[in-house]
Amino acid sequence: MTEFETIKNAFARVRADLEIYEFENIGSKSIYIPAGDGEIELEFDGDGKLIDTNYLHD
């Protein structure tokens, strides 16, 4: 199981009420998790390894 799958499944189990969504771009995937007045982005490479995190807000 890749880091991407592990983290995605963990959030789904712990916070099933959150609307977690994913976006696939050329060569990478991101998971977006609501947090405060923004969201946390977890970016993974093509092999499912976590490569970057960001807090996005208006």
Segments the model singles out, each with a brief description of its role:
Residues M1-S28, L56-D58:
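N-terminal acidic leader/helix
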Residues G27-D58:
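Detector for the mature cores of small, proteolytically processed
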